[in-house]
Structure formats: C-alpha cells, structure tokens
Amino acid sequence: MAYHTPFAAQPPVASSGLPLTLISLDDWALVTLTGADRVKYLQGQVTADIDALSADQHVLCAHCDAKGKMWSNLRLFYRGEGLAFIERRSLLDNQLSELKKYAVFSKVVIEPQPDAVLIGVAGSQAKTALAEIFTELPSTEHPVTQMGNSTLLHFSLPAERFLLVTDTEQAQQLVEKLAGRAQFNDSKQWLALDIEAGFPIIDAANSAQFIPQATNIQALNGISFTKGCYTGQEMVARAKYRGANKRALYWLAGNASRVPAAGEDLEWQLGENWRRTGTVLSAIQLNDGTVWVQAVLNNDLAADSVLRVRDDALGTLAIQPLPYSLAEDK
C-alpha cells in the first residue's frame, strides 16, 4: 500500500470501540525551534516552564497575547536537540508571526516543518503494533521517545494512543506493516479522541479569544505559576489568584441536525426558553450519529443542564464527565 495523506475519511469512533487505526494528522502542523537561545526564548512566550521540561516529556501549554488571550495552544516536546510543537494548521501562520516577533534579538530559529509526517496510532492493540517497528516505545512515565528521525508521543487519554512525528520513509514502512489489520482514517478521528480526552482545540476562529484557564489548560498541568515572566502572565495569574476566570471547557454529547462550526454559540435551556451561551471550539459526528461538541461555557453550569446547537429545535446536548479534575489549589 503506497503512503499518501490524508487517509480516506471514515466516520470517527469513540475510543471504547475503536479498532487499531492509523490516522493522518493533516489538520495539525509541526514547528521546530533550534539555536542556543531556544529554551530561553520560548520560556518568555508560553505558559509552561520550559526549563523544567525533560527530553522524555511533552506538555500542552498556551501562547498568549499581552492580555492573556491564547493565540494558540501547543503540544510541546524535544525533537532531537531542538524543541518542537504541534498545533492546529488553521492558525499556524498567524501564531508563528506572533511567536517570531522578538526572535531577531535572540539566537533562535523558528520554522514550520511542512515535510514532517504526523500520524496518530490509536485503538485496540496500538502499542503491540508499534512494538513491531520501534524497539523503544513511550509510556505514561516517559511519554516521549526518539529513534532516528522519528519522535513518538504517548497519550493516556481518553485511552492509550500514540502520535508519531517522522519522515515519509518511516511512514511508508508503518503503513505497509499494518495495512492488513489496521483501519485508516483522517484527522477527524484524532479530533474526536481529543474532544473525548478534554484536550482543548484552538482553531483560527477562536484565536485570541480565551485565557488558558477557560479551556482547562491549568488542569492539564500546562501553566506554571512559579516561572519567570512571559507574555500575558499578569492576566493568567490574575485569573487564578483573583478568581477572574468564570469559564471552563466542556464536553457535550447528544443529537443535532448539524455539526456546529468553531466560533458558534450554543443555546441553553431555561424553563421553556432557550438562551444563547458559550462558544464552540470543535465538534464532530460519530459513526453512530452522536454529535460531540467541545465548548467554552460558564464554569458554574449545572451538570444536568440541557443545551443544543443554535436554532436546532429537535436536538439536545448533555454535559459529559471529563477524565480529569478541575479542582485547583489556591
């Protein structure tokens, strides 16, 4: 089987019923940072403590404007001697222009890697399948491994899965090895798994709209409140220590006559009436017809609240439990 992306689209499946699946991640992009100042420069730009990031760890963090609003969130890790991050392709160009603003004063080279191949490996027996190709696999304790031109990231949520950053040659080998027993799918399958995991999806429509805590990044250990200064730090800290954040990320599931787009609002049932509320970050329809919506809503919303896609008289969406706690130490 010849390697080419994106893989043919299939309706996404929830993690509990997902067979071994290779997923082309064309809706995501890879960026690398190299040079002597790569750590120092990024430390002043993102919410995570880059000084504390080890070579066998990855972190989801935020890149904010001066008001603490996220240009993007980034899945950050070491790749070779340099740093790398993965973000949604829809906002790549704008986010990079913001990240590079002061790079001319530092010894750092920040550049997209359009030739890199990103493949998700998920579903039943994902680890066993990868073990046939890679001698060392990442784990919960050591979620990043490097082998030659390949970097493997391990995710525990919503179920064990892997993200492979590699070149075309290695991708071809993986596809050939697993072609007889794996399904293939496009980016929407990985998107569904991220929604189920409660990992915030920031696309261009929602860039510079939310502080990190409105999308639960603090609950995913993506914000350091003890590191030095970074762009937007004052507003991010205020949200924690002064209780300024009134929003949170939610996972909703139910039925809808259409899949809402990023940036749309939803409707919340109040007695006999419906009131507009929140912002959709991402949404997907599964193979069984269920619609999943990831949205930013008021963080005091009752767990039994009924919502729906805007103007969808026949649909209802219910809040689903996230696989992590939002309880915070003050």
Curated annotation (Swiss-Prot):
Cellular component aspect of the GO annotation: cytoplasm
Major site of localization recorded for this protein: cytoplasm
Q: Which UniProt keywords apply?
A: Cytoplasm, Folate-binding, tRNA processing
Question: Which InterPro entries does the UniProt record give?
Answer: GcvT/YgfZ_C, tRNA-modifying_YgfZ, YgfZ/GcvT, YgfZ/GcvT_CS, YgfZ_barrel
**S-S bridge residues:** none
Where it sits in the cell: the answer is: Cytoplasm
Q: Which Gene3D superfamilies match?
A: 2.40.30.160, 3.30.70.1630, Aminomethyltransferase beta-barrel domains
Q: Which GO terms describe its biological process?
A: iron-sulfur cluster assembly; RNA modification; tRNA processing
GO terms for MF: folic acid binding
**Residues that, per the record, bind folate:** W28, W190
Give any Pfam family that matches: YgfZ_barrel
So what family is this one in? Belongs to the tRNA-modifying YgfZ family.
Function text: Folate-binding protein involved in regulating the level of ATP-DnaA and in the modification of some tRNAs. It is probably a key factor in regulatory networks that act via tRNA modification, such as initiation of chromosomal replication.
Report what the protein is called: tRNA-modifying protein YgfZ
This chain's source organism reads Yersinia pseudotuberculosis serotype IB (strain PB1/+)
- Organism classification, top ranks? Bacteria, Pseudomonadati, Pseudomonadota, Gammaproteobacteria, Enterobacterales
